[in-house]
């Protein structure tokens, strides 16, 4: 984690399947941004939080932004805020996810 030197990128900030769609012409659209400057990996991490996108999305994305070493561990860090937020708002199974994330982070 300490060797990761991300470049600030303007990210969507809430990129999950509920915020993407197709317009009348058949073009893909994204909406409901919560944009901020961050490591581009935060958007990809968010896409994996609630089921993920199709394989082709990731293949095309990683042609532009190749996967960097340690990404799989950073997914947990980048999604921790979102899991805490959902646990605060909805409780339920999100509380167990928070516990699991804490265990994974402590074991890194």
Residue ranges and their predicted role:
Residues 4-10, 17-73:
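Active-site Asp-x-Gly
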Residues 13-15, 80:
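Short, well-ordered beta-to-alpha junction loops that form the rim of enzyme active sites
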Residues 52, 82, 93:
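Short alpha-helical
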Residues 77-86:
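Short helix/strand-capping connector loops at secondary-structure junctions
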Residues 86-108:
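ATP/Mg2+ or Mg2+-diphosphate-binding catalytic cores
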